[in-house]
Amino acid sequence: MKVKILMVCLGNICRSPIAEGILKSKLNSNNFFIDSAGTGSWHDGNKPDLRSIAVSKAHHIDISNQNARQFTYEDYKNFDHIYVMDQSNKKNVLSLAKTLEDRNKVQLILDELIPNSNLEVPDPYYDEDQGFENVFQMLDKACESIVYRFLNF
């Protein structure tokens, strides 16, 4: 049975596509299913931001085939773990939770590095290219921690 992991950000074009791509590059698709979504619907069906595609490509990860979609309650049924990028994402995702089991699936992705730190991955949308590289580095470290946890426990 596959472990199903969902990455969530605001529009599903910057942070969560990068996180999805990184985690897919580190975990075997025979044992893990990884996807991403956004809390908003503005970009439904769109490809990731060109800067997200570029920074991922610079690290040998291709996210150009991803398409943005909005997080729905069905995602609670379809995923075992839901990682959000910031407190606003967390609040929006939790607003759709119906059970304690739903709520327990949700966590800030950087809590993988420093538990209960409430650290956030900043949205690089209005930033320069370096902001995307910084986000990539944060997410790469967090995904390394996720991989370690799932493969060693």
Where are these regions (language model features)?
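Helix N-cap/beta->alpha junction signal
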Residues: 16, 86-87
